[in-house]
Amino acid sequence: MRRPGPHNARMHPLDRPVWASLSGPQLRLSHGDDLARRFDPQVNVFASARDDSPQALAALAALVAPGERIFVLQVPPIAVPDGLVAVKLAQGVQMVATRPLGGEAVSEGVRELGDDDAADMLQLAQLTEPGPFLARTHRMGGFVGVRGGDAAGARLLGMAGERMRLPGYTEVSGVCTHPDGRGRGLARGLSAAVADRIQRRGEQPFLHAWKTNVAAIRLYESLGFVCRAEVQVAVLERPAAAG
């Protein structure tokens, strides 16, 4: 796995995937300028500076209100801007698909998820904690899921979808299974279904997992994903104003 230095002038877009997304295909979901951007706070909590220059880091800090938190995810070491504090630092892995995944995709009972499913999606994400997931995160890309029956209001048992998009790549994310749906291979099948959709568009699927989540990494490796790089993750906060 590569670990580019912080001054690598020819950095791959996947090394700063949040920036590549917010300054590219997902610009419409962003706030900021050419130095730093963040997702709309109702969509996601990720943000990124263009680089580690003082100007870009200052612009990133300016996007964060007192008492607010953002997530930064990138391959290079994370520089904490003046005015912000790191309340969490962790490592993950970035994985890319290396083979077609259509044969692994689950199809029975799979349905498209949208605004009408948003409350159930948020509830499932809060229960299983697949990563940052907010009320409008599902608008970042297509999501699919399986419910526990055909009746109206049947429990959402599993879901997966698309998060960051950059030229040539789309991230598989939001993969989670309700405890009542475990043992059915939903995480595997839904991940493959989303990845297959991405591949059919001519793009390469990628994803992120916590470095300590060995079970998830093994699942994705069994689907043909390989580790491209380790990623650094930081939760940054601007302390609330005194008084």
Where are these regions (language model features)?
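N-terminal charged segments
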Residues: 1-80
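Short amphipathic alpha-helix that is part of the acyltransferase structural core
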Residues: 3-14, 94, 98-131
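Conserved beta-strand-loop-alpha-helix junction that forms the acyl-donor binding cleft
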Residues: 72-77, 179, 197, 206-217, ...
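A conserved beta-strand-loop-helix scaffold within acyl/acetyltransferase catalytic domains
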Residues: 132-142, 146-176
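Conserved acetyl-CoA-binding loop-helix of GNAT-fold acetyltransferases
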Residues: 55-60, 183-199, 217-222
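Conserved catalytic-core motifs of GNAT/GCN5-like acyltransferases
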Residues: 85-97, 226-243
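A short, internal acetyl-CoA/4′-phosphopantetheine-binding micro-motif in the GNAT/acyltransferase core
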Residues: 47-51, 175-182
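Conserved active-site alpha-helix within GNAT-family acetyltransferase domains
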Residues: 78-84, 188, 211-229
